[in-house]
């Protein structure tokens, strides 16, 4: 009998618009899709990508400036040593994928699905990538919220990294006491207030009336755990819920999701 095909669904923001004070736009964060994709691909999982609308554009700071050539743009990302909210510089392999549009990664991106067309029964892992764009669209992405909840209730693993946990408070399960978020009573982490402040992005959050994730997740009943190093690799697993604190945690978050599964 052939082995069962294992499937991962990577969810990301479909917002692409103003955020940074240098005039650049936020969007889906490149490495937070690429790194999990590479982990799941190497584990022989089939990978699909989904957004609420099916559209994806990458955060300008995640595909240019400090992520590739430090100092060329995005100066606020260069304010905290060399760790920066965008994570390390792209490696040669990562640059190759970014520049080689024939790579399978780009085929999956170009064939991204809309949330309302996806069958949740197909997927073992629901992985949520970040980028500040999630703060704009995830609270209203009702089909994406329902999709992730269904995968979780089917016994799947839900993982989210950096600003990806923005979706989690809106993923509701039914209990005898009514509807509660899947993070209620769970240990979680995410890109927190300290990281936002050290990245000098609090002003932008206030400008666009966006909530910091510490508050959002605590308000949903989660036990928020801060990373000891705002830009260091940090992952929390609580049952079938896995969260990572920043872009540097994307690979570890994906690997932990596989171990939990």
From Swiss-Prot:
E.C. designation(s): 4.2.1.130
GO MF annotation, one: glyoxalase III activity
Spell out the catalytic residues. 162-163, 196
Q: Which domain of life is it from?
A: Eukaryota
User: Which EC class is this protein assigned?
Assistant: lyase
User: Per UniProt, which keywords does this protein have?
Assistant: Lyase, Stress response
Catalytic activity entry? methylglyoxal + H2O = (R)-lactate + H(+)
- Record-linked CDD domains: GATase1_Ydr533c_like
Gene3D superfamilies recorded for this chain?
3.40.50.880
Q: Which GO terms describe its cellular component?
A: cytoplasm
Any Pfam family from its record, for instance, is DJ-1_PfpI
Record InterPro entries? Class_I_gatase-like, DJ-1/PfpI, Prot/Nucl_acid_deglycase
Q: Which GO terms describe its biological process?
A: methylglyoxal catabolic process to D-lactate via S-lactoyl-glutathione
Its annotated function is as follows:
Catalyzes the conversion of methylglyoxal (MG) to D-lactate in a single glutathione (GSH)-independent step. May play a role in detoxifying endogenously produced glyoxals. Involved in protection against reactive oxygen species (ROS).
Query: What family is this?
Result: Belongs to the peptidase C56 family. HSP31-like subfamily.
Protein's recorded name: Probable glutathione-independent glyoxalase hsp3103
Q: Which organism is it from?
A: Schizosaccharomyces pombe (strain 972 / ATCC 24843) (Fission yeast)
């Amino acid at each position: 009998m052939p082995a069962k095909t294992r499937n991962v669904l990577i969810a990301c923001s479909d917002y692409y618009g103003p955020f940074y004070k240098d005039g650049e736009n936020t969007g889906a964060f490149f490495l937070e899709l690429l790194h999990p994709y590479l982990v799941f691909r190497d584990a022989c999982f089939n990978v699909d990508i989904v957004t609420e609308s099916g559209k994806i554009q990458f955060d300008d700071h995640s595909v240019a400036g400090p992520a590739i050539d430090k100092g060329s743009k995005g100066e606020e990302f260069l304010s905290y040593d060399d760790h920066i909210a965008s994570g390390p510089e792209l490696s040669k392999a990562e640059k190759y994928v970014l520049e080689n549009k024939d790579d399978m990664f780009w085929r999956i991106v170009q064939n991204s699905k809309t949330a309302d067309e996806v069958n949740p029964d197909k997927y073992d892992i629901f992985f949520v990538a970040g980028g500040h764009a999630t703060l704009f669209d995830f609270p209203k992405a009702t089909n994406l919220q329902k999709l992730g909840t269904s995968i979780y209730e089917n016994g799947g693993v839900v993982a989210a990294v950096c600003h990806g946990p923005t979706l989690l408070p809106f993923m509701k399960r039914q209990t005898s006491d009514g509807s509660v978020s899947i993070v209620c009573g769970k240990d979680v982490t995410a890109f927190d207030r300290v990281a936002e402040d050290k990245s000098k992005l609090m002003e932008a959050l206030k400008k666009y009336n966006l909530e910091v994730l510490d508050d959002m997740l605590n308000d949903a009943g989660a036990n928020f755990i801060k990373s000891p190093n705002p830009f260091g690799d940090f992952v929390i697993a609580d049952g079938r819920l896995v969260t990572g604190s920043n872009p540097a945690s994307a690979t570890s978050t994906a690997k932990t999701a596989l171990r939990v599964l």
